């Protein structure tokens, strides 16, 4: 059971809720803060104060005062009018993350809602009711209005959801689950949609997969190093201590560990003095990506526990309008993730080239073909890797430097954070496929060298991966192999498989 406080949710805990479906509850003390915030809103309404989004219109219509008899209708109108996102729906794990993060943000007690709103979000999460939320349509300020409106509509029994493996009207799922539809009070519609939970949810998913790939890429690279008689001296601890980047030194240490006991690695000057950069500079490049990912994690965990509503309601009764909904911190972090993880594939594709190019492969068969000429072997797999890394370069264009005015120029700078997060996720999927191709090629290459000469660690990787993809003895439809290895890499991290002896 994960207990949400609004202040301490971690990515590790979020993972358990998103993927393992661990139940979630709200901390009692946080719910008390929510009640106090709601009381402050009700007092402000009773006193006749003008409060944005409570008794006014929205965006450029903020100066329009709404009659007291229409305040609840205002909130449902907001959800309906803003639920106009388009495109394919977010995956269920992203929607689960959105539900989790919105509930956690509201538990901070700055949004002026009733506790029942949070209870409904958690009921959806714990019951496995996942609103259908189209991916496109958010500018990332004021938060993720369109996607979150689709999420919130399901709470009131409108829109569609996935429930028990079926797509159905939200009201039908609520009936089957025994959950009454929510009736919105003042401020609650705005509180549900004014936040960055779509981009942050997508960012958490992208980060979790990117982090796994960062570590997996080192294992796969180690196998390639052996296949190419790599020079181990480049990973000497003294080199990396001399520069001072912790992550670079960590990558070098892991490579030394993975390659310990190998009979295929060479020493400086034995076959050549030094390797090409895609081998020699693995610690420097992969380490830089890992360093960037750690910044991304820090940013996401701050945002996961942030109040991103507007206005914010404080315990002393103050109602302050600000801009915490602006997604720029997450947008920049997602753009950084895009660059960091794309670089892993850039390096991997160059190592693939060295495995298949007879001028670079230290005597391996051209394109790792069992019968070069008659059989093309891995030739086109390198093409596919080249295509994917080139696509990544387009996707990695920063979204956060793009802005377009909206709401009659009232919202004249936006973050495009959800676009950044969506593209980050696409890049991660491409990177995994490139690494799958490198692994397939490296497996074939080390067979040519002699698998009895592998290091103990890479030997484990070889034998586990060979259960997924067979040796290349003749040309076949290699897309199936790539898909199988891609799925294998996504299912569980290599380090977890080898450390725990997990079955595939």
From Swiss-Prot:
Highest taxon of source:
Bacteria
Protein localization: Cytoplasm
Gene this chain is encoded by: hutH
Q: Which UniProt keywords apply?
A: Cytoplasm, Histidine metabolism, Lyase
Q: What is this protein called?
A: Histidine ammonia-lyase
Return the InterPro entries for the record: Aromatic_Lyase (IPR001106), Fumarase/histidase_N (IPR024083), HutH (IPR005921), L-Aspartase-like (IPR008948), Phe/His_NH3-lyase_AS (IPR022313)
Q: Where is this cross-link: 5-imidazolinone (Ala-Gly)?
A: 141-143
List the PROSITE patterns hit by this protein, alphabetically.
PAL_HISTIDASE
Its EC number(s): 4.3.1.3
GO terms of biological process kind: L-histidine catabolic process to glutamate and formamide; L-histidine catabolic process to glutamate and formate
Single annotated GO MF: histidine ammonia-lyase activity
Q: Which NCBIfam families match?
A: hutH (TIGR01225), PRK09367.1 (NF006871)
What the entry lists under CDD domains is as follows: PAL-HAL
Main location (coarse class)? cytoplasm
What positions are modified (2,3-didehydroalanine (Ser))?
A: 142
Q: Which GO terms describe its cellular component?
A: cytoplasm
Enumerate the catalysed reactions.
L-histidine = trans-urocanate + NH4(+)
Q: Identify which top EC class this enzyme belongs to.
A: lyase
Modification after translation is described as: Contains an active site 4-methylidene-imidazol-5-one (MIO), which is formed autocatalytically by cyclization and dehydration of residues Ala-Ser-Gly.
Q: What is its pathway? A: Amino-acid degradation; L-histidine degradation into L-glutamate; N-formimidoyl-L-glutamate from L-histidine: step 1/3
Query: What does the sequence similarity comment in the record state about its family?
Result: Belongs to the PAL/histidase family.
């Amino acid at each position: 059971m994960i207990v949400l406080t609004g202040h301490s949710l971690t990515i590790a805990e979020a993972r358990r809720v998103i993927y393992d479906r661990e139940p979630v509850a709200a901390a009692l003390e946080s719910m008390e803060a929510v009640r106090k915030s709601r009381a402050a809103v009700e007092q402000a309404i009773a006193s006749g104060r003008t409060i944005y989004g409570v008794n006014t219109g929205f965006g450029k219509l903020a100066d329009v005062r709404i009659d007291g008899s229409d305040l609840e209708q205002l909130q449902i109108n907001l959800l309906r009018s803003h639920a106009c996102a388009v495109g394919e729906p977010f995956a269920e794990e992203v929607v689960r993350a959105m539900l989790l993060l919105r509930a956690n943000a509201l538990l901070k007690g700055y949004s002026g809602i009733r506790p029942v709103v949070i209870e409904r979000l958690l009921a959806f999460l714990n019951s496995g009711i996942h609103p259908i939320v189209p991916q496109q349509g958010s500018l990332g300020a004021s938060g993720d209005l369109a996607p979150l409106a689709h999420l919130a509509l399901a709470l009131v029994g409108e829109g569609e959801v996935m429930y028990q493996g079926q797509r159905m009207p939200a009201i039908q799922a609520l009936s089957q689950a025994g959950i009454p539809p929510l009736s919105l009070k003042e401020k609650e519609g705005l509180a549900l949609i004014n936040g960055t939970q779509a981009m942050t949810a997508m960012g958490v998913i992208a980060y979790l997969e990117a982090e796994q790939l960062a570590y997996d890429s080192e294992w796969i690279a180690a196998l390639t190093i052996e296949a190419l008689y790599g020079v181990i001296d480049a990973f000497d601890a003294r080199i990396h201590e001399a520069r001072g980047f912790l992550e670079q030194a960590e990558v070098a240490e892991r490579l030394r560990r993975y390659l310990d006991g190998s009979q295929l690695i060479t020493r400086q000057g034995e076959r050549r003095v030094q390797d090409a950069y895609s081998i020699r500079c693995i610690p420097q490049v992969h380490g830089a990506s890992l360093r960037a990912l750690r910044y991304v994690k820090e940013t996401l965990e701050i945002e996961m526990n942030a109040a991103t509503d507007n206005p914010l309601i404080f315990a002393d009764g103050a109602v302050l309008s600000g801009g915490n909904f602006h997604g720029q911190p997450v947008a920049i972090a997602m753009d950084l993730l895009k660059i960091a993880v794309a670089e892993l594939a850039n390096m991997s594709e160059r190592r693939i080239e060295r495995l298949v190019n007879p001028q670079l492969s230290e005597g391996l068969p051209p394109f790792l073909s069992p019968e070069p000429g008659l059989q093309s072997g891995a030739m086109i797999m390198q093409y596919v890797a080249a295509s994917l890394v080139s696509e990544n370069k387009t996707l990695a264009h920063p979204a956060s430097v793009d802005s377009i005015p909206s709401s009659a120029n009232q919202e004249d700078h936006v973050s495009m954070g959800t676009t950044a997060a969506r593209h980050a996720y696409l890049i991660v999927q491409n990177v995994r496929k490139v690494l799958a191709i490198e692994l397939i090629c490296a497996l074939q290459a080390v067979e040519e060298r002699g698998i009895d000469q592998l290091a103990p660690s890479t030997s484990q990787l070889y034998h586990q991966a060979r259960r997924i993809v067979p040796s290349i003895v003749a040309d076949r439809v290699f897309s199936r192999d790539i898909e199988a290895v891609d799925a294998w890499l996504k299912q569980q991290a290599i380090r977890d498989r080898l450390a725990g002896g997990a079955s595939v």
